[in-house]
Amino acid sequence: TDRTREIVAEYTATYPFIRLIDNPDRIVPPAMNKGILASKGDVIMRLDAHSTYASNYFSVLVKALYDLGADNVGAVCKTDVLNKTPKTLAIKEVLSNKFGVGNSTFRTGIDRVMEVDTVPFGCWRRDVFDKYGLYDVRLVRNQDIELNKRILRGGGKICIVPDTYCTYLARETFSALAKNNYGNGKWNILTVFYTKQFDSLSIRHFVPLAFVLSLILPMLFSFLFWPLSLLSVLSLIAYTLLLGTISAKLSVSKKLHFGYLLASFVVLHVSYGWGSLVGLLSLPFQPKK
């Protein structure tokens, strides 16, 4: 419906080395695996839609891959929005802020080459997939993070470089932001469930779940001992104070809408944490894969 096939056909008419490979599974891991297995070169690079790439993206990453002796390299992924309004600019800022996305280096920016636990998209030597395996086809999301953790677990090296960048076009409505992060949160739990490796993800991926549980669990157990409800109140007060302080500073320093900043942070954190909680509750009903 988005003219993908037509667009690819236009490119193949000009560049005959481009090939379109069908992916009936309609999720990322099988698509990547089909592409990797069909590849003929020494370097694999993943480029996702809804993103744009700097003109030197290819050359910088391929050079860094060999110069650094890395198994995977990537660059900072800047966040932007297509339609710039007070709401979308607030969402953009929240998705680039440490209070929004944690210590996610590739989102918050770097000024030097760093070894990291994951990078967006990726640039690998082809033989890396022979050594560490292909994408895990069970994972609808987080498949890139899981692959990178597997590489590190096997003694590999992942680097992020500052000399190029890509730009991700973020969701522009609160409903779309919530839907996306609900799915991310849910698949954090399912990723650990299917891989049986807690370190398939990082601690930051579970902070929203901890926040949501800090609100819900004390209230549930307060039926047995009512003072426990105060823990929920304290958690909410602490979050509100932190949220208000950070949003106020961003509003003043970057001239952004205070209310939209508040709403963006809350939607991001609560939808992500709620998704993780739903994922946790769904574990007894998950099929074995």
Model segments located where?
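Short aromatic/hydrophobic "clamp" motif used to bind/position activated sugar donors
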Residues: I44
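Conserved donor NDP-sugar-binding/catalytic core segment of glycosyltransferases
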Residues: N56-L89, E93, Y165, L169
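Short, conserved alpha-helix that lines the donor NDP-sugar binding/gating region
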Residues: R5, A9, V28-L37, N148-K149
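A conserved acidic beta->alpha catalytic loop
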Residues: T1-E6, D25, D48-T52
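Glycine-rich, basic loop-to-helix element that forms the pyrophosphate-binding segment
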Residues: L20-S39, V60
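A recurrent flexible, glycine/aromatic-enriched loop bordering the glycosyltransferase active site
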Residues: T79, G102-D127, L139-V140, E146, ...
